[in-house]
Each structure stands twice: as C-alpha cells, then as structure tokens.
Curated annotation (Swiss-Prot):
Name of the protein in its database record: Ribonuclease P protein component 1
Compartment(s) where it occurs, according to its Swiss-Prot or TrEMBL record: Cytoplasm
Biological processes, Gene Ontology terms: tRNA 5'-leader removal
Pfam families to which the protein is assigned, alphabetical: RNase_P-MRP_p29
Keywords of this entry: Cytoplasm, Endonuclease, Hydrolase, Nuclease, tRNA processing
Catalytic activity: Endonucleolytic cleavage of RNA, removing 5'-extranucleotides from tRNA precursor
Main location: cytoplasm
HAMAP family: RNase_P_1 (MF_00754)
Family: Belongs to the eukaryotic/archaeal RNase P protein component 1 family.
Enzymatic class: hydrolase
Enzyme Commission number, as recorded: 3.1.26.5
Length: 88
C-alpha cells in the first residue's frame, strides 16, 4: 500500500500528479495521470494530451489517502526498478 512515508519506493504509473515547482515555469500546475516512467522522465496524460516532463527539475504533488505529498524530483530520478529495490 502506498503511503506518504513510502511513496518514493513505489510504482508511480497510474497515479495522478501535479507539478508544484519547476525550473521551467511553463510546466508549473501541469497535472494528469502518469502513463509511463523512465529514469529521468514521467509521461503524463493531461487534458491537452501526453507530455514528457523531466523528473529532476520539478517537485511533484501526489494525493495519497486524502493527503497531499510533495516529492522532490531529484529523489526519484532513478530507474523505477532501482528505486523500488528490484533484484536481477
């Protein structure tokens, strides 16, 4: 189960997110559902279509159990497999 304490060790695909801070002011406020994740990017399904956004340059807001959790992109800028702790 995803909680505010363990969100950085879970899968993000399928979660809704919003960019609350970024080095690129044009993406602040962008929100939608995460459709894909790579080491450095999220692909988000927004009202205006799919957008690929760099993880490390933004802070991301997720709503978990009616609580908003802000995650620094630099903390999650890893391959999902490595972040989750998978073994080969």
């Amino acid at each position: 189960m995803i909680t505010a304490d363990n969100i950085t060790s879970h899968e993000f695909i399928g979660l809704n997110t919003e960019i609350v801070q970024s080095t690129n002011p044009q993406v602040i406020g962008l929100n939608g559902r995460i459709e894909n994740e790579t080491k450095s990017m999220f692909t988000i399904n927004t009202e205006n279509g799919m957008k690929s956004i760099a993880k490390s340059t933004s802070n991301w807001k997720f709503s978990i159990d009616s609580n908003d959790v802000i995650v620094e992109g630099s903390r999650i800028a890893k391959r999902p497999f490595d972040r989750i702790g998978g073994k080969a």
